[in-house]
Regions:
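A general structural motif
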Residues: 1, 38-43, 93, 126
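ATP/NTP phosphate-donor binding region
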Residues: 23-27, 31-89
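C-terminal and late-domain segments of enzyme folds
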Residues: 1-39, 48, 54-58, 145-226
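Structural motif
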Residues: 6, 95-99, 130-131, 157-158
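Class I SAM-dependent methyltransferase SAM-binding "motif I" and its flanking Rossmann-like core
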Residues: 105-169
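Short glycine-rich anion-binding loops that position phosphate/pyrophosphate groups of nucleotides
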Residues: 10, 101-103, 135
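Short, flexible loop segments at the rims of nucleotide/cofactor-binding pockets, characterized by
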Residues: 19-23, 72-77, 106-109, 161-162
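Flexible gly/pro-rich beta->alpha loop and the following alpha-helix that scaffold active-site loops
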Residues: 76-128
Length: 226
């Protein structure tokens, strides 16, 4: 089975007007590229969750091209792309990176287009999967709001954890207990690299963290992943 990189978010990805701006690659980006054995890996960006915003794709493309990647964009909205074309693009990639945005919208589009099936197939073929925010949620069984993902990681995920309100953290904790599932919380500028049942943290800054949360023996146990 493949490798999945789940990113909690990136500070400074947008300006005050919510426009995606150029950014310099950070430690997590370098780590994603290192996971490929190729000098110039083919990286497929999937921006469904942001409604395929061009400014987001350009920002991502420039960052990853500076690392030597050959970057392509998967656009499925407002065009006549076929399932066969989608599948070919996905399975011919070395790395697939799913961007941030609206999780439920993204998952609904994926199911209608068959993208979900293609990504599961890519995982089985050891294609590297990565993503941020909604692009992290999609690999898990659920996100903290119980939006269903692809269940490649049989846990509940909460991203942007360092800026979540008490109410949203409570919702996350409640759903861990109700569903008897392990929870994974990831701060902005932190990521977890999953390989099978093992995972490790990679972070851009020392104060960015991730947590493993379970409900056992009538209480919650939250452990920082180090």
């Amino acid at each position: 089975m493949g490798t999945i990189i789940c990113i909690g978010g990136l500070v400074g990805l947008k300006n005050k007007e919510k426009v995606f701006i150029p950014y310099s690659p950070r430690k997590i980006d370098f780590e994603i590229m290192k996971l490929s054995t190729k000098v110039n890996p083919k990286v497929l960006f999937i921006g469904t969750a942001s409604s395929e915003r061009e400014d987001y794709y350009i920002s991502f493309k420039n960052a990853y091209e500076s690392l030597g990647a050959i970057v392509e964009n998967l656009c499925v909205l407002n065009n006549n792309i076929t399932f066969e074309e989608i599948r070919k693009k996905i399975l011919s990639s070395d790395i697939i990176y799913v961007g941030c945005g609206k999780t439920k919208f993204m998952m609904d589009v994926w199911k209608s287009k068959g993208i979900d099936k293609c990504l599961i197939e890519a995982y089985k073929k050891d294609i590297i999967l990565a993503g941020m925010s909604a692009g992290s949620y999609c690999w898990f069984k659920y996100n903290y709001e119980m939006i269903e993902g692809l269940d490649l990681i049989h846990m509940i995920n909460c991203v942007h954890y360092d800026e979540k309100s008490k109410e949203k953290k409570k919702q996350f904790y409640d759903n861990i207990k109700k569903n008897n599932l392990r929870g994974i919380a990831i701060d902005n500028d932190a990521s977890l690299i999953f390989s099978g049942t093992d995972y490790k943290i990679v972070k851009n800054y020392e104060n960015s963290k991730a947590y493993d949360i379970v409900f056992e023996d009538g209480k919650y146990i939250e452990k920082e992943i180090i």
